[in-house]
Amino acid sequence: MKKVLFLLLACAAVAFAAETNAPVEQEAINVWIKAFSVLAAGLGLGVAALGGAIGMGNTAAATIAGTARNPGLGPKLMTTMFIALAMIEAQVIYALVIALIALYANPFIVLQ
C-alpha cells in the first residue's frame, strides 16, 4: 500500500510541475478543475454533514441516557451536550467554507 501511495504522489508531483504554454490546453484543464471542484465540494460537504449528523445523534442519545440514569445531572449534561453540538457543527461549517472556496475562489485555476 505504501508503494502505491508513493507512486501516486510521485505522479501527482510530476503532473503539477508540468507547465503548458497552449491557452487551449490550459482552458481545457480549467474546465476539468471546475468540474472536479464541484464534485469534491458536493462529496466533501455530504460526508461532513453525514458525520456531523451521526455525531449529534450519538451525543443526544448519550445525554438522554445519562439524564435517565441520574436526573440530578440533567442541567450539567445539557450544557456539556450543547457545547459538544456546537463543536460538531463547527466542523460541518468548516467543510462548507472549504467547499465554497473550491467553488467560487478556486486557487487551482490558472488565469490568463
UniProtKB/Swiss-Prot annotation:
Its localization reads: Cell inner membrane
Q: Which GO terms describe its cellular component?
A: plasma membrane; proton-transporting ATP synthase complex; proton-transporting two-sector ATPase complex, proton-transporting domain
Gene3D superfamilies annotated for this entry? Answer: F1F0 ATP synthase subunit C
Keyword Nucleotidyltransferase set for record: no
Give the record's keywords alphabetically. ATP synthesis, Cell inner membrane, Cell membrane, CF(0), Hydrogen ion transport, Ion transport, Lipid-binding, Membrane, Transmembrane, Transmembrane helix, Transport
The record's family statement is: Belongs to the ATPase C chain family.
User: Which protein are we looking at?
Assistant: ATP synthase subunit c
Organism this protein belongs to: Campylobacter jejuni subsp. jejuni serotype O:6 (strain 81116 / NCTC 11828)
